Amino acid sequence: MAFKIASSPHVTRNLHTSTVMQRVILCLLPGLVVQCAFFGWGTLVQVLLAIIVALSAEAVVMKLRQRSIKASLSDNSAMLTAILIGVAIPPLAPWWMIVIGTAFAIIIVKHLYGGLGHNLFNPAMAAYVLLLISFPVQMTTWIAPSTVAMHSPSVLDSLQLIFNIGANVNMDQFRLGIDGVAMATPLDTLKTDLSMGLTRTESMTKAIFDGATGVGWFWVNLAYLAGGLVLLKLKAIRWHISTGVLAGLFIASSVGFLLSPDTQGSPLFHLFSGATMLAAFFIATDPVTAATSPRGRIIFGTLIGILVYIIRTQGGYPDAFAFAVLLANLCAPFIDYYVRPRSYGHSAG
């Protein structure tokens, strides 16, 4: 049998940062499209506004630091951060919120720590937490999905509400479902109903639910899952963190559901609600703020999944990924320290 022998050097080509970011952005698009389909044009407006703010802030900081503006903008990291913030916040949130959050992510969280590759926390999630703590009402006011909404916002409606211009529309009319009741997210609805003494089965008879999952949110998560799988296929991310996140959340929610099925959401509900798939494939996998070794990445991802379940069921914020990711970011150096690969020729430890 003849074997083909290639000439040296026997190396593989590493992906440039800009290429990786481009692939991540492209794989985000299916989720963004589905999210716009269910929650209106406001999401796209928020994303575009966030991109403008992020690129402007990046350019200003690079100018002040006397670094190359072109090189910094062309790595696409600021644009990716902007898109993640834009899809994470409610689609009709006031314009100044996305401006504050994006500027905070780029200027404070990213560049105050030294720029790309030096930040301790995920910039998008740090910005989300800042906005959530500072403006809890606006950050938890989502409109009803288009398929069960009494009224869906047009492009003009979205612009008027986001930029607070015109007086012929208000947020409340877009929160009403076809049953005439103001809607919250499935996670919010279930948590509120359980706190009022209703069972899971009773809560899930509401219009915001479709079987075991939430209306709209199942398809949004499915779209981000599809994009995430393509991202894995393109080798832009590794499988360890995403698998750890989903496994940790699945195991924790399965235990809770088996122990108390009347007061806990099912594993399927947790996996396809809120930002689960978005966070598992596009947020938690940030290589700068995550653990570095393969075993460390699995532990890092699993920790996020478990924290999400604990915060969702015991905390005050039903979609807990931002807090879980930031807490795991804090733990990443410790995970790397205690889960170091054994050096060749040396014993473990």
Curated annotation (Swiss-Prot):
It is a multi-pass membrane protein. Its main location: membrane. Its cofactor is FMN. Keywords: Cell inner membrane, Cell membrane, Electron transport, Flavoprotein, FMN, Membrane, Phosphoprotein, Translocase, Transmembrane, Transmembrane helix, Transport. The modification FMN phosphoryl threonine is found at residue 185. It holds the Pfam family NQR2_RnfD_RnfE. The keyword ATP-binding does not apply. It is found in: Cell inner membrane. Its EC number is 7.-.-.-. It comes from the Bacteria. One of its GO terms (biological process) is transmembrane transport. The chain crosses the membrane at residues 37-57, 73-90, 124-144, 212-232, 239-259, 265-285, 291-311, 315-335. InterPro entries: NqrB/RnfD, RnfD_bac. GO terms for cellular component: plasma membrane. NCBIfam families: PRK00816.1 (NF002011), rnfD (TIGR01946). Belongs to the NqrB/RnfD family. The complex is composed of six subunits: RnfA, RnfB, RnfC, RnfD, RnfE and RnfG. Part of a membrane-bound complex that couples electron transfer with translocation of ions across the membrane. HAMAP family: RsxD_RnfD (MF_00462). This is Ion-translocating oxidoreductase complex subunit D.
